[in-house]
């Protein structure tokens, strides 16, 4: 499945450091999900899923509650999802997924980042066809064969189940992520460190130290933008 998910998580955690910026981005995502349906996670499955992911990222309860209360109070901001794709040095590719209340601002900011950080923004679909939209589930465990049987019995479309450093890592078809989570919960597995939809590169590249420095600057700048929710790439040594 390309780069190991455990390695991605470790690097992301070290970079994010559970900062206020991460909290703010989850706050926006929670608010948007609450506005699109009922502001009650028990009747809004999309909101429930975002809240579960926020808790996995150790977002404080008061941040979650504030975003829901804002939606309940009739906040009038409307957020739109977007995806921007482009290239870095020597075959490196990057995808930025956004959630914004001002699309024109976001487009301008993303273009500026690519131009200033040594990248080239591409047209829609220029990069994403080289990535697979994948459900990823991670939890503590050491018996991938047993987990695979659970998922197989529940008719979950599974791409792979591995064990990495004491964690079970499951890759599903994107459409079966929630079905996989439900099957695991029915089997008594209720504590997850990751339940995400991710774009995973079909193949990776290794960059030289010089090119890696340029590409890391591009990725960091994209991740630092307030409207960017997720950044995916195909560089194995980042």
Swiss-Prot record:
HAMAP family: Transcrip_reg_TACO1, Transcrip_reg_TACO1_YeeN. One of its GO terms (cellular component) is cytosol. One of its GO terms (molecular function) is DNA binding. This is Probable transcriptional regulatory protein YeeN. It comes from Salmonella typhi. It comes from the Bacteria. One of its GO terms (biological process) is regulation of DNA-templated transcription. Pfam families: TACO1_YebC_N, Transcrip_reg. Keywords: Cytoplasm, DNA-binding, Transcription, Transcription regulation. It is found in: Cytoplasm. Belongs to the TACO1 family. YeeN subfamily.
């Amino acid at each position: 499945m390309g780069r190991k998910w455990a390695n991605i998580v470790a690097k992301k955690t070290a970079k994010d450091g559970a900062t206020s910026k991460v909290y703010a981005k989850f706050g926006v995502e929670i608010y948007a999900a609450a506005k699109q349906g009922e502001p009650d996670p028990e009747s809004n499955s999309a909101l429930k899923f975002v809240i579960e992911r926020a808790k996995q990222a150790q977002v404080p309860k008061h941040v979650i509650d504030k975003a829901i209360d804002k939606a309940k109070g009739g906040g009038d901001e409307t957020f739109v999802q977007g995806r921007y794709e482009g290239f870095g040095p020597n075959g490196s590719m990057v995808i930025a997924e956004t959630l914004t209340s001002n699309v024109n601002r976001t487009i301008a900011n993303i273009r500026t980042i690519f131009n200033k950080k040594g990248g080239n923004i591409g047209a829609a679909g220029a990069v994403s066809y080289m990535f697979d939209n994948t459900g990823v589930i991670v939890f503590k465990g050491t018996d991938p064969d047993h987990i695979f049987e659970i998922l197989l019995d529940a008719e979950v479309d599974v791409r792979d189940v591995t064990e990495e450093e004491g964690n079970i890592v499951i890759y599903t078809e994107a459409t079966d992520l929630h079905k996989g989570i439900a099957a695991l919960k029915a089997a008594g597995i209720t504590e997850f460190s990751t339940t995400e939809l991710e774009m995973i590169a079909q193949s990776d590249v290794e960059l030289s130290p010089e090119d890696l420095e340029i590409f890391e600057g591009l990725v960091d700048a994209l991740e630092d933008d307030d409207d960017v929710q997720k950044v995916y790439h195909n560089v194995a040594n980042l």
